[in-house]
UniProtKB/Swiss-Prot annotation:
Claim: Repeat is one of the keywords in the record: no
Residues reported to bind substrate: R87, R93, N125, R156
Single GO term (MF): L-lactate dehydrogenase activity
Organism from which the protein derives: Bacillus pumilus (strain SAFR-032)
UniProt EC number: 1.1.1.37
Protein's name in the database: Malate dehydrogenase
Family matches, as SUPFAM superfamilies: LDH C-terminal domain-like, NAD(P)-binding Rossmann-fold domains
Domain of life, source organism: Bacteria
Record family assignment: Belongs to the LDH/MDH superfamily. MDH type 3 family.
Sequence positions bearing Phosphoserine: S149
Enzyme class: oxidoreductase
UniProt key word Manganese: no
Pfam families referenced in this protein's UniProt entry, alphabetically: Ldh_1_C, Ldh_1_N
Residues that, per the record, bind NAD(+): G12, A13, G14, F15, T16, G17, D36, N100, L123, T124, N125
Length: 312
């Protein structure tokens, strides 16, 4: 019997959603359904058709459709949520909470109605709280609802380190813990260039500057763009997670996972090292933290909890 083609639905056809859809199709991970609200159905269909017409040129075989009808998403293996209002200059992530929570709850009801077996990956900001809202609304096990921020934050950290050392980014590894915000915790002790600890290659003050730039990475792009926020790197980070799930790769990657006692926290979604595979979240990896790292993580958790207080 022939293998059934995989199906990924991307909710939200803005810059991030559309880029996620295109990269997913380009890598031939699955057929893609791009979804947006009825008022934007034609532009969504137009983007999907434009991507599809790129397939003969790029040489990929994946069907891409645009729609506002959730029935078209039925039977999805993975659903990615990028829908929501965007952050504007000067706007804190917390300002987004109430509006985006309503969007998350409404979208989630449609997802579980048509794809009850799907694994859901959330990107919408503030992502720790929005992933929690999706989890609560969905009724799915925690393994099937995960958020994306750590891959993006780690990618930014790796980029800045590679620039500092004038090395290939391929040789730089790192890990970022905590919430997706100014209190994220880049774990410098677990960061390497070609297997060599960063602390032996870069002076402390330069590492501190890189950590600070990583924390402000999203805001830096928001300010440069003047209108809108980052989308290429967030989309690429999402697709790395989608690939790990669809191919059951069991990749070690930082994701936003629901904690039930891990790291000493309970009932909260937080960025931690995890193993991602065919079941979604396969395992949470607990690292030994120094006192300073622990206190930074506590601060990060408090920030996430403060955002979660706004949730209904």
């Amino acid at each position: 019997m022939a293998n059934k083609r995989k199906k990924v639905s991307v909710i939200g056809a803005g810059f991030t959603g559309a880029t996620t859809a295109f990269l997913t199709a380009q890598k031939e991970l699955a057929d893609v359904v791009l979804v947006d609200i009825p008022q934007l159905e034609n532009p969504t269909k137009g983007k999907a058709l434009d991507m599809l017409e790129a397939s003969p040129v790029q040489g990929f075989d994946a069907n891409i459709t645009g729609t506002s009808n959730y029935e078209d998403t039925a039977g999805s293996d993975v659903v990615v949520i990028t829908a929501g209002i965007a952050r504007k200059p000067g706007m804190s992530r917390d300002d987004l909470v109430s509006t985006n929570e309503k969007i998350m709850r409404s979208v989630t009801r449609e997802i579980v109605k048509y794809s009850p077996e799907a694994i859901i990956v959330v990107l919408t900001n503030p992502v720790d709280a929005m992933t929690y809202a999706v989890y609560k609304e969905s009724g799915l096990p925690k393994e099937k609802v995960i958020g994306q921020s750590g891959i993006l934050d780690t990618a930014r950290f790796r980029t800045f380190v590679a620039q500092e050392l004038n090395l290939s980014v391929k040789d730089v590894t790192g890990f970022v813990l905590g919430g997706h915000g100014d209190d994220m915790v880049p774990l410098v002790r677990y960061s390497y260039a070609g297997g060599i600890p960063l602390e032996t290659l870069i002076p402390k003050e330069r590492i501190d500057a890189i950590v600070e730039r990583t924390r402000k990475g999203g805001g830096e792009i928001v300010n440069l763009l003047g209108n809108g926020s980052a989308y290429y790197a967030p989309a690429a980070s999402l697709v790395e997670m989608v690939e790990a799930i669809l191919k059951d790769q069991r990749r070690v990657m930082p994701t936003i996972a629901y904690l039930e006692g891990e790291y000493g926290y309970e009932g909260i979604y937080l960025g931690v090292p995890t193993i991602v595979g065919g079941n979604g979240l396969e395992q949470i990896i607990e690292l030994e933290l120094t006192e300073e790292e622990r206190s930074q993580l506590d601060r990060s958790v408090e920030s996430v909890k403060n955002v979660m207080k706004v949730l209904s």
